[in-house]
Amino acid sequence: MNEEVWAVVKYKPKEGCEPEFIDALSTLDMSHVVLNRYIKAYNGEIVQIVQSCNIDEVLAGQVAGLEWLDSVSHLLEHYGESRTDAISGVIIDDA
């Protein structure tokens, strides 16, 4: 499958843990994707925006990404049962 995939992942650092979490972002290897950017939202969340050429790129980083998330889990508030609030999908060419 050659469809371009975009993902948006939100993280909510616990109070007082934001600097450590932001430092930890630099240890996440995202060299397998086209674009990886972080923004700090006004509500305190850290938002990751990722562009991948295809689903194979997404899968290539999945294990390492989950291991990294495990390593920073203690720094994060949860979204219900989840450590992140994430969504992904493919580009709509005709829009």
PLM feature spans:
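An amphipathic, aromatic/His-enriched active-site/gating alpha helix that lines ligand/cofactor pockets
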Residues: 27-37, 51-86
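Acidic/histidine-enriched, glycine/proline-rich intrinsically disordered or flexible terminal extensions
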Residues: 85-95
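Short, surface-exposed ligand-recognition loops at beta-strand->loop->(often short) alpha-helix junctions
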Residues: 10-23
